[in-house]
Amino acid sequence: MAAKKQPRTKAAGKKAPPQRHQKQKAVARRPTPARKPSASRGPSTVHRKPSVAVRVKPYDVGPLTDWPAYDGPPLGAHVSTAGGVAEAPARADLIGATAMQIFTKTPNQWREPAITADEAAAFKAALANSGVRFTNSHDSYLINLASPDSAIRARSIDSFTRELERCHALGLDALCSHPGNFIDDRASGIARNADAITECLEARPGPTRLLMELTAGQGTVIGSTFEEMAELIERIPAALRRRVGVCLDTAHVYAAGYDLVGDYDGVWERFDAVLGLPRLGLIHLNDSKAPFGSRKDRHELIGVGTIG
């Protein structure tokens, strides 16, 4: 989330003091609380069909005593796990979230820490004492299950399998994953991606559902069209396919050419016809910095970008 360019003072020609990020209209305004440590964050996250979600920094929020009544599908955001995964549910409560996405590890490193029994127990206890009703993880940004490079693909399979282990240990509802980059040939990449997912799901059975995230279509990435995502999922054996669903990121699909502004109902009708609404497990609500059909993955705060 990029900070706004700061104005220069005319008198001294120096930059004005940094300003806080503007909160989105959906957030009730309140006094700014004491600053808390920052940590990793991701896109707004909601389970199934939300009405609105908000991207916020952990240190920008405090308890919301005036949070409006909400009884819809689980709705929330990506929250920090700084200090341990057991800290995340309380942070979700600070913003009134009933859905929560986390990283179970640092997403831009190959290091694969296991979740200990004590960590899992503490997380589950904290979750039970929170208002969160849906939890999911987002996997590592380094994973490429479609890679033609055997070493990268093997390392990706190992990392993805360990991510499933951590999700199962924590009892998470879902794991959100980006399809890989085919690099050489699209059809071969889709086949490699599906085979790798199959291998991982067979190796780690459990309750966590895998949600494949639709992409913006940049470079050689797989999964920017409903048809391509359907092909990927259909290549997974039927016995395992029931554990696989879809995550729709609004910024991604808009950049990929699905007109959420001019043909909102039509986009969902197409999704249902090709993938089926029962496969929809998660929506990432993001605005887009990039224009419609640009095939660029550039997130923006809701209401600020090209979706509006």
Describe the residue ranges of each PLM region.
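Alpha-helix-loop-beta-strand connector modules within alpha/beta enzyme cores
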Residues: A117-S137, A194-P207, L232-P237, T306-G308
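Hydrophobic faces of well-ordered beta-strands that scaffold small-molecule active sites
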Residues: P73-V79, T98-I102, T135-D139, L175-S177, ...
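Active-site acidic/histidine proton-transfer and metal-coordination neighborhood
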Residues: L145-G245
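Alpha-helix termination/capping residues and helix-transition junctions
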Residues: L94, N129, A169, V274-L277
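A short helix-to-beta-strand connector/capping loop
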Residues: D71-P73, S130-V132, G206-P207, L240-R243, ...
